[in-house]
């Protein structure tokens, strides 16, 4: 008789994805982030579900309902801070996962990569709408500023913004619909994750060398299940340390003030994981130009397979490209720092230089360097 896990229609899918999956034997810890992202999504959906049981999406009671969760609900404070800081862990894993893909040339799996970009946009939209829900000062003004960017779209912009708001300003209708979208989007993300995995398992995983690893595959279980569990323990340790020792470290103090449309906070800024894109947006004086730069700062990921000039897939054996990759990483840290600073000298010019450098490295320097490396190796 065939093994149950290999014969049952449902178990067969799980078996082929997580148990008997042939995996390259040399994948490093950078390949852990896929499973960590899955864990983050699970944590966010679970904690979010329990928060939604006590939250009210009304402008008059939203702020109070979050306070009520923290003060009166059993372990409500734990669920709330796990959800808020879980989002930060989610984005840390996302950035590292994308960085891994860029470094080792995983973007050559086009379908998997493109679904990944759609996933990134979906998760960013979810996080943005979630930030609006507590209805603090930064929630309200963040929602106002970011939705207002759509008014830069010619001809239909203003109508579009008012349609999204459900009125002439961010108000009750906006909060209610943002809650509805924030609730449904993670399930859409989960469905997209399935598609992401489906396409990945069509080709099999990449590996650090960037070479074909069909001759050296090992089963996913027990080798990588145990490796993923170690990663998961580290993730949970970091998350719980953050939640239990300094839950407000990554938050904004302004969000402990209830939303007031009549008083603008001195510095409106999004959560830390959007600051790099916010810095790029602000570095262009023109509104439409800024919005386009903001969108393309993420969409630029889609052109990576097209600008792969190097004969080698991975950067593992390409020291010049490695140097550029780490300069790009440092540039993103710089942009994140600038995004949190006020719009004044010298931050304006630093932000503009960092923005130009970001696009230049990807569009000009990386392809040029790949050409040079090919020539050096007489390819």
UniProtKB/Swiss-Prot annotation:
Cofactor binding comment, as recorded:
Binds 2 heme b groups non-covalently.
Write out the GO biological process terms. mitochondrial electron transport, ubiquinol to cytochrome c
For the keyword S-adenosyl-L-methionine, the answer is no
Protein keywords? Electron transport, Heme, Iron, Membrane, Metal-binding, Mitochondrion, Mitochondrion inner membrane, Respiratory chain, Transmembrane, Transmembrane helix, Transport, Ubiquinone
List ligand-binding residues for heme b b566: 97, 196
PROSITE patterns, per the entry: CYTB_CTER (PS51003), CYTB_NTER (PS51002)
Instruction: Report the transmembrane regions from the record.
Output: 33-53, 77-98, 113-133, 178-198, 226-246, 288-308, 320-340, 347-367
Query: Which CDD domains did the record assign?
Result: cytochrome_b_C, Cytochrome_b_N
Compartments (UniProt record): Mitochondrion inner membrane
Q: Main subcellular localization, coarse class?
A: mitochondrion
One Pfam family from the record: Cytochrom_B_C
Residues given in the record as heme b b562 binding sites = 83, 182
Query: What are the record's GO terms for cellular component?
Result: mitochondrial inner membrane; respiratory chain complex III
Q: How does it sit in the membrane?
A: Multi-pass membrane protein
UniProt binding sites for a ubiquinone: 201
GO-annotated molecular function: metal ion binding; ubiquinol-cytochrome-c reductase activity
Q: Does the keyword Cell inner membrane apply?
A: no
As cofactor, the record names: heme b
User: What does the record's miscellaneous section state?
Assistant: Heme 1 (or BL or b562) is low-potential and absorbs at about 562 nm, and heme 2 (or BH or b566) is high-potential and absorbs at about 566 nm.
Subunit comment for this entry? The cytochrome bc1 complex contains 11 subunits: 3 respiratory subunits (MT-CYB, CYC1 and UQCRFS1), 2 core proteins (UQCRC1 and UQCRC2) and 6 low-molecular weight proteins (UQCRH/QCR6, UQCRB/QCR7, UQCRQ/QCR8, UQCR10/QCR9, UQCR11/QCR10 and a cleavage product of UQCRFS1). This cytochrome bc1 complex then forms a dimer.
What function does this protein fulfil? Component of the ubiquinol-cytochrome c reductase complex (complex III or cytochrome b-c1 complex) that is part of the mitochondrial respiratory chain. The b-c1 complex mediates electron transfer from ubiquinol to cytochrome c. Contributes to the generation of a proton gradient across the mitochondrial membrane that is then used for ATP synthesis.
Q: Which family does it belong to?
A: Belongs to the cytochrome b family.
Task: Spell out the protein name for this chain.
Answer: Cytochrome b
């Amino acid at each position: 008789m065939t093994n149950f896990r290999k014969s049952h229609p449902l178990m067969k899918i799980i078996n082929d994805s997580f148990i008997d999956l042939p995996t390259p034997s040399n994948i490093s810890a950078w390949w852990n982030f896929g499973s960590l992202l899955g864990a983050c999504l699970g944590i966010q959906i679970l904690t979010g579900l329990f928060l939604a049981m006590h939250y009210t999406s009304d402008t008059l009671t939203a702020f109070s309902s979050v306070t009520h969760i923290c003060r009166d609900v059993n372990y409500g404070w734990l669920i709330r801070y796990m959800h808020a800081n879980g989002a930060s862990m989610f984005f840390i894993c996302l950035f590292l996962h994308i960085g891994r893909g860029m470094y080792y040339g995983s973007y050559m799996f086009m379908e998997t990569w493109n679904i990944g970009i759609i996933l990134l946009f979906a998760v960013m939209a979810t996080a943005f709408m979630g930030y609006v829900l507590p209805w603090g000062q930064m929630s309200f003004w963040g929602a106002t500023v970011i939705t207002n960017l759509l008014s830069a779209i010619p001809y239909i912009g203003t109508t579009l913004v008012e349609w999204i708001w459900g009125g002439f300003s961010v108000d009750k209708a906006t909060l209610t619909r943002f809650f509805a979208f924030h609730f449904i989007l993670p399930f859409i993300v989960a469905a997209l994750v399935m598609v992401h995995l489906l396409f990945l398992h069509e080709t099999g995983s990449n590996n650090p060398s960037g070479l074909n690893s069909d001759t050296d595959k090992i089963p996913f279980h027990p080798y990588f299940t145990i490796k993923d569990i170690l990663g998961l323990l580290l993730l949970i340790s970091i998350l719980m340390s953050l939640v239990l020792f300094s839950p407000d470290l990554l938050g904004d103090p302004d969000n402990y003030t209830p939303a007031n449309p009549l008083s603008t906070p001195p510095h409106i800024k999004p959560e830390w994981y959007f600051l790099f894109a916010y810095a790029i947006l602000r570095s262009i004086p023109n509104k439409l130009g800024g919005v386009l730069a903001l969108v393309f700062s993420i969409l630029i990921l889609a052109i990576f397979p097209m600008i792969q000039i190097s004969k080698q897939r991975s950067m593992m054996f390409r020291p010049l490209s490695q140097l550029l990759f780490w300069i790009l990483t440092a540039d993103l840290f710089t942009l994140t720092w600038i995004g949190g600073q006020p719009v004044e000298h010298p931050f304006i010019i630093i932000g503009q230089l960092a923005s130009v450098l970001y696009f230049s490295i990807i569009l000009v320097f990386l392809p040029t360097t790949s050409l040079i490396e090919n020539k050096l190796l007489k390819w």
